[in-house]
């Protein structure tokens, strides 16, 4: 909000704690919910960002959540998720994870993105 003072920012989180402790500048536009049923109209946002959250969803929520991100975005999207490329990184992720539910390789994430028709940018985070 400080970088783009004329912007309209909204957020959704599954954590009541995160909503209650959100930044004062946007707190009134944060809602409790899950990405598989976003309350905004089609093409509502100029930019949709999901950072380190999709891997916290159960596998059965991934497809709908990715489709919802696609639906509410006019064009620009970015997401970042946890992933692993080998057994060591998978073990590191398993030991680290507290809320991670979707453990996917890069190829598996790409499969989910393609299945959902997700055409935005993304990055994968690894525990080396």
PLM features: what roles do these ranges have?
Residues 53:
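Conserved sequence/active-site signature of Rossmann-fold short-chain dehydrogenase/reductase
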Residues 73:
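Glycine-rich S-adenosyl-L-methionine
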Residues 40:
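Carboxylate-rich, divalent-cation-coordinating active-site regions
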Residues 45-46:
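Local beta-strand N-terminus motif with an aromatic residue
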Residues 49:
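A conserved beta-strand element that flanks and buttresses the S-adenosyl-L-methionine
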Residues 1-37, 57-64, 68, 76-128:
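Class I (Rossmann-like) S-adenosyl-L-methionine-dependent methyltransferase catalytic domain
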């Amino acid at each position: 909000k400080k970088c783009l003072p004329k912007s309209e920012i909204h957020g959704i989180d599954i954590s009541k704690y995160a909503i209650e402790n959100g930044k004062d500048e946007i707190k009134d536009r944060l809602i409790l919910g899950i990405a598989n049923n976003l309350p905004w109209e089609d093409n509502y946002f100029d930019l949709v960002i999901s950072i380190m959250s999709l891997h916290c969803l159960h596998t059965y929520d991934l497809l709908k959540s990715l489709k919802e991100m696609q639906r509410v975005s006019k064009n620009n999207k970015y997401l970042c998720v946890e992933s692993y490329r080998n057994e060591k990184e998978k073990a590191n992720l398993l030991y680290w994870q507290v809320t991670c539910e979707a453990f996917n390789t890069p190829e598996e994430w790409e499969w989910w993105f393609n299945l959902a028709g997700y055409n935005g940018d993304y990055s994968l985070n690894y525990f080396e």
